Swiss-Prot record:
Keyword Kinase in annotation: no
Superkingdom per UniProt: Bacteria
Identification of the protein by name: Nucleotide-binding protein SGR_5570
SUPFAM superfamilies for this protein: P-loop containing nucleoside triphosphate hydrolases
Keywords: ATP-binding, GTP-binding, Nucleotide-binding
Binding site for ATP: 55-62
Cited function: Displays ATPase and GTPase activities.
Amino acid sequence: MTENTHETAPNTADTDTADFDTADTDRADGAADVSTNTPNETGEAAIPELVIISGMSGAGRSTAAKCLEDLGWFVVDNLPPALIPTMVELGARSQGNVARIAVVVDVRGRRFFDNLRESLADLEAKHVTRRIVFLESSDDALVRRFESVRRPHPLQGDGRIVDGIAAERDLLRELRGDADLVIDTSSLNVHELRAKMDAQFAGESEPELRATVMSFGYKYGLPVDADLVVDCRFLPNPHWVPELRPFTGVNEEVSDYVFDQPGAKEFLNQYTELLQLIAAGYRREGKRYVTIAVGCTGGKHRSVAMSEKLSARLAAEGIETVLVHRDMGRE
């Protein structure tokens, strides 16, 4: 299955800003808000699956949590880390009614972080299946988001927003290294973030491997969350063909032009074969997701056309694919 997200990310991070979690960053009292879903009426008692959502304030933790809630997860927001094992135990006593728990953890102090490490060690000792999803974003994007909603960063104190961001990034550095999934939302709007979450968690049975194919423009920077990067700048640029310049790689005229160039089809065929080899290795290593970044100069023509074809090829090979055109609308 291929999911196309042709909505393009603007060069500022203020789209749907309120749907990212800057609005929740002033809740430092540790009070837990519990969002419940209708439980199943069947099922035996079992240890529930656990996802821990954390990351930078303003990077989209609340959006990620809402996505999981929509997918039927039992979501607990702003839960003190020390209570995570208790929540899992309560889920295990629910006789199968709570099979999947997502916990949003807001680590704002050293003691909170120590409690989280202790809780993770406790869960590991009890053989609880857990995943850590870490949401991050660039300093510039986070500053724009906080400024757009006119809220201070929870850790800035009497300083500036950038001071709070720096303090939080340093505090979360170790947790980011332990994360199973890191999502950079610097250039994503909320719809694209939801698409990424859906790619990882949607469906009753998860596929063996899920891929995000993302076209981008080198002039706007490499996607920081890319696992593999493809450079399409070896192909002639449709930008210099006047009748093609207004179009994008989604349009048939541009796609035909790109794949009529020497080496284009051969590259697509050989790279698809290479990805099949890599995918087999990822499966053996237990890797569940991969982000493939496909770049050209501006992210409008060549990379878009190649990403369209590549995502279709991967879907035909049984790899569930999300297609994102990061920079297609910037020029």
